[in-house]
Curated annotation (Swiss-Prot):
InterPro entries: Membr_insert_effic_factor_YidD. Residues 71-96 are annotated as: Disordered. It is found in: Cell inner membrane. Could be involved in insertion of integral membrane proteins into the membrane. It comes from Cupriavidus metallidurans (strain ATCC 43123 / DSM 2839 / NBRC 102507 / CH34) (Ralstonia metallidurans). Its main location: membrane. Disulfide bonds: none annotated. Belongs to the UPF0161 family. The keyword Cell membrane applies. GO terms for cellular component: plasma membrane. It is a peripheral membrane protein. Keywords: Cell inner membrane, Cell membrane, Membrane. This is Putative membrane protein insertion efficiency factor. Residues 71-84 have a biased composition (Low complexity).
């Protein structure tokens, strides 16, 4: 199912997107967001996340940077290069 959804997104980006123009107010674009969400979270949850994102993308929204949230457990895992005994450095970026 995941491969079918990704193929449909690829067809949309190649066949329809050039004719519709860039209308997305977010970065990454809604189609890129959908692809990333499906890859990271699977077909069902990724499709739900993409549908919610499409509902947020309208002319009255501010838009801005809105990446796909990380899967549970990956954000808190320390990097492999972290020194033993020292906590990893966490960088928090301001929300747009």
């Amino acid at each position: 199912m995941k491969r079918i959804l990704l193929a449909l997104l690829r067809i949309y980006k190649i066949a329809l997107s050039p004719y519709l123009g860039s209308q997305c107010r977010f970065l990454p674009t809604c189609s890129d967001y959908a692809r990333d969400a499906i890859v990271q979270h699977g077909a069902a949850r990724g499709t739900w996340m993409a549908a919610c994102r499409l509902c947020r993308c309208h002319p009255f929204t501010k838009g801005g940077y809105d990446p796909v949230p990380a899967t549970h457990g990956t954000a808190a895992a320390p990097p492999a290069s972290a020194a033993p005994g020292r906590p990893p450095v966490t960088v928090r970026l301001p929300r747009p």
